[in-house]
Amino acid sequence: MQHPREENSIVVELEPSLATFIKQGFNNLVKWPLLNIGIVLSNTSTAVNEEWLTAVEHIPTMKIFYKHIHKILTREMGFLVYLKRSQSERDNYITLYDFDYYIIDKDTNSVTMVDKPTELKETLLHVFQEYRLKSSQTIELIAFSSGTVINEDIVSKLTFLDVEVFNREYNNVKTIIDPDFVFRSPFIVISPMGKLTFFVEVYSWFDFKSCFKDIIDFLEGALIANIHNHMIKVGNCDETVSSYNPESGMLFVNDLMTMNIVNFFGCNSRLESYHRFDMTKVDVELFIKALSDACKKILSASNRL
């Protein structure tokens, strides 16, 4: 019998500075948005609004929006969840299956419901207190992924709720919603001594390998773009940016990308320190090829799960 959820690890042995570069890139670039734009529309439960919003913010949405991973990571798409639930004598709890899940196209603000796996019925979110016929508890709320712009156009697409109530409650809380992009990394990644390890969760209802490939492809593209955009100051070294003096051969390392790339070519650098190093040894295209080969190796390892 296949379990709905399994914990696994994907391990590849790489040159240590390259492994560190990929780990740091993953942690800094692969940002899965949280549901931090939450609005409670109605609540007669014993849990206060803040408790509901905190619980909903951290719903593991990647296992629901798995068909849209790449566009969510590039922020071409966002998503929202909606819950409207009343306590009954027979149903005295709420699971993740009780929510409706929608993908948001950020170009058009179109809102499209996605299918939800029946396995979500096994994930408990809230238990109501003892049922009483004359005081049944209800909850209605909506939460958007971080970075979603709430405007008249997108609100007009929320045909499943009372727009007047939404506008009133949103106006009450919008000043306390964090304007920054709030996110989590999809996986824990470590790289001790070049042993790059992804700790992942595999679910039975979707093709994890395909989703993992979407993530690694996004990461590789973002890292290569960052490499091409990276600059090292040439001339007298100062301690505000990474800089190199060709006459003295002194390199000042002030960022992680410089540190990892020069270490790949034989330097033993640390952040915020000076090193004597011949920068002509650095071949950016060779480093990019090594990065692409490493990503292929990671995907090959994931296929063995």
Swiss-Prot record:
GO terms of molecular function: DNA binding; DNA-directed RNA polymerase activity
Keyword annotations of the record: DNA-directed RNA polymerase, Nucleotidyltransferase, Transcription, Transferase, Virion
EC number: 2.7.7.6
Record carries keyword Transcription: yes
Assembly, per entry: The DNA-dependent RNA polymerase used for intermediate and late genes expression consists of eight subunits 147 kDa, 133 kDa, 35 kDa, 30 kDa, 22 kDa, 19 kDa, 18 kDa and 7 kDa totalling more than 500 kDa in mass. The same holoenzyme, with the addition of the transcription-specificity factor RAP94, is used for early gene expression.
Protein name (Swiss-Prot/TrEMBL): DNA-directed RNA polymerase 35 kDa subunit
Keyword Transferase carried by entry: yes
Subcellular localization, as worded in the UniProt entry: Virion
Role of this protein: Part of the DNA-dependent RNA polymerase which catalyzes the transcription of viral DNA into RNA using the four ribonucleoside triphosphates as substrates. Responsible for the transcription of early, intermediate and late genes. DNA-dependent RNA polymerase associates with the early transcription factor (ETF), itself composed of D6 and A7, thereby allowing the early genes transcription. Late transcription, and probably also intermediate transcription, require newly synthesized RNA polymerase.
Broad class of enzyme this protein falls into: transferase
Pfam family, one: Pox_RNA_pol_35
GO biological process per UniProt: viral transcription
Family the entry assigns: Belongs to the poxviridae DNA-directed RNA polymerase 35 kDa subunit family.
Gene Ontology CC: DNA-directed RNA polymerase complex; virion component
Recorded catalytic activity of this chain's protein: RNA(n) + a ribonucleoside 5'-triphosphate = RNA(n+1) + diphosphate
